């Protein structure tokens, strides 16, 4: 792994941690309970994809859109705070994406449980 890639990986992990902490301090109700699941950053540190999810899941598309709009509205403040906490010369542009993986996993588990419960009832 080259030094540039290693640095990008380290910065991405630190950015994930810092954003997680900074988001807890924001008072916007649209982003209450948001969790940062991962951050992907370009090698030149110019742009970061921030993958987020809701603590309790966001089943409907409207809730996801509201969450992402709240994050977009806060992105300027978050970039300023990241610049202060991380001490980077170049602060990446933050782009937010909803991470549907945990919600899909939870839904699959529910469906499997329903199937299991349904097949148990048929045997009785």
UniProtKB/Swiss-Prot annotation:
Keywords: Cytoplasm, Ribosome biogenesis. GO terms for cellular component: cytosol. Its main location: cytoplasm. GO terms for molecular function: ribosomal small subunit binding. Pfam families: RBFA (PF02033). The keyword Ion transport does not apply. GO terms for biological process: maturation of SSU-rRNA. It comes from the Bacteria. The keyword Phosphoprotein does not apply. It is found in: Cytoplasm. NCBIfam families: rbfA. One of several proteins that assist in the late maturation steps of the functional core of the 30S ribosomal subunit. Associates with free 30S ribosomal subunits (but not with 30S subunits that are part of 70S ribosomes or polysomes). Required for efficient processing of 16S rRNA. May interact with the 5'-terminal helix region of 16S rRNA. Belongs to the RbfA family. Monomer. Binds 30S ribosomal subunits, but not 50S ribosomal subunits or 70S ribosomes. This is Ribosome-binding factor A. It comes from Sorangium cellulosum (strain So ce56). The gene is rbfA.
């Amino acid at each position: 792994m080259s030094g540039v890639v290693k640095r990008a990986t380290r910065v991405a992990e630190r950015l994930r941690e810092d954003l997680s902490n900074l988001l807890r301090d924001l008072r916007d109700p649209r982003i209450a309970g948001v969790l940062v699941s991962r951050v992907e950053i370009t090698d030149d540190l110019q742009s970061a994809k921030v993958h987020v999810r809701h603590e309790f899941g966001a089943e409907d598309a409207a809730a996801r859109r509201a969450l992402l709009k709240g994050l977009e509205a806060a992105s300027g403040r978050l970039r300023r705070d990241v610049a202060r906490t991380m001490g980077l010369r170049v602060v990446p542009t933050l782009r937010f994406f909803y991470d549907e993986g945990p919600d899909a996993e939870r839904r699959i588990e529910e469906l499997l449980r329903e199937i299991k419960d349904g097949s148990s009832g048929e045997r009785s």
